[in-house]
Amino acid sequence: MDFWKFFPFLALSTIWVLCLASSLQAAPFRSALESSLDLGTLGDQEKHLLLAALMQDYEQMKARKLEQEEQETKGSRVTAQKRSCNTATCVTHRLADLLSRSGGVLKDNFVPTDVGSEAFGRRRRRDLQA
């Protein structure tokens, strides 16, 4: 008796497999990557719609990537910041650098400031050898 309950299922599945096999022989399955899109057959409006869809997908992908990067940076407590020095020595060095890099009429007459390690006002280290 179990055979007669199973027989209709077996018959229907066999018919389905045969239909599927015959349809694959008639038109072979091609993946989306294998099929090439011929832009010559598309009209102007279809080309514009395709371009708009591609741009929208690209923008969404970039937005998701930016959101993901923002979430990653929010999660980390350590932020990479350049340390700045605001002491008089650092400011003097920056100003001297700016003046030396800036060109202009006064460049020929410009005398560089003495901002080295032996500049006026700096403590001189005593030699330990003496």
Curated annotation (Swiss-Prot):
The residues of the propeptide are 27-82, 127-130
Q: Does the UniProt entry include the keyword Signal?
A: yes
Q: Which GO terms describe its cellular component?
A: extracellular region
Q: Which residues carry this modification: Phenylalanine amide?
A: 120
Tissue-specific expression: Detected in nerve cells of cerebrum, hippocampus and pons/midbrain in newborns, and only in nerve cells of pons/midbrain in adult.
Q: Report the sequence similarity comment from the record.
A: Belongs to the calcitonin family.
Which positions carry the signal peptide feature in this UniProt record?
Answer: 1-26
Q: Relate the protein's function as given in its record.
A: CALCB/CGRP2 is a peptide hormone that induces vasodilation mediated by the CALCRL-RAMP1 receptor complex. Dilates a variety of vessels including the coronary, cerebral and systemic vasculature. Its abundance in the CNS also points toward a neurotransmitter or neuromodulator role.
Specify whether Secreted is a keyword of the entry. yes
Q: Which cysteines are joined by disulfide bonds?
A: 85-90
Q: Report the superkingdom from the record.
A: Eukaryota
Protein name, please? Calcitonin gene-related peptide 2
Sorted alphabetically, the keyword list is: Amidation, Cleavage on pair of basic residues, Disulfide bond, Hormone, Secreted, Signal
Q: Which Gene3D superfamilies match?
A: 6.10.250.2190
Which subcellular locations apply to this protein? Secreted
Gene Ontology terms for molecular function = hormone activity
Which PANTHER family would you find in this protein's record?
CALCITONIN GENE-RELATED PEPTIDE 2, CALCITONIN-RELATED
